[in-house]
């Protein structure tokens, strides 16, 4: 694995948080291509991949979290739809920091 990559459990958050402020001060939009990460700088672009189905999406870090171990990322509801894990709620995902 590349030094800018990680693998771990990702989850999603969505409609219940719509309109609330994210950690960087934006209003959360469940359809936006955004994610929460505990340490990466805001506005970092991350390719999140679901190895189970081969889907991937580029997301922008705009929030902090997840706060549940051992999860490594929370993605927006829209991103989870595109990655194909809304029903499961969790996925073992691959994260690759871009740029």
Language model features: what each stretch is:
Residues 1-99:
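Secreted/periplasmic proteins
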